[in-house]
């Protein structure tokens, strides 16, 4: 990979990993509501699911030409529906002001999110088909870059969770407003899938 292509790869992957999306918003919300330690299950579920999805993207990227457009469209609708459901859960979740201690979303729920998270699917397919496959079609490289993509995505999730933890006091003071803003950002993510 040339230095120019490598810099484009890093720019694309880091910007995509650090911008708002379902995982980052969920990580921020969970750490704000429950603290970083209690959010580690959420982050672990995301990370494992992310890795598996990136490996699946590697396989998909190899056979991109034969993907049924109807299946991709169906996946987009399923992803949008799940993201809207997640937005509803965040918008209606109790805050500390409400005097309730809701538990964070489970490992398995955050794991399952990855399989309908269109942002990471597109992230994986785009990175692999744009930066890797034109350079090499060696399976070891494709798998290696898939693992790297999952690590970069996990880094973004942890950064957002740490921000939620570090600004917890401020976010708790304005918990209801924050939850509504985060929910609206998720709805925006769902809408952006189609437009």
Swiss-Prot record:
Tagged with keyword Transport: yes
InterPro entries for the chain: LeuE-type
Record GO cellular component, one term: plasma membrane
Superkingdom of the source species: Bacteria
An annotated GO BP: cysteine export across plasma membrane
Keyword annotations: Amino-acid transport, Cell inner membrane, Cell membrane, Membrane, Transmembrane, Transmembrane helix, Transport
Gene Ontology MF: a single term: amino acid transmembrane transporter activity
Major subcellular location class: membrane
Subcellular location: Cell inner membrane
Matches recorded under NCBIfam families: PRK10323.1 (NF007653)
Family: Belongs to the Rht family.
Name of this protein: Cysteine/O-acetylserine efflux protein
Species this chain originates from: Shigella flexneri
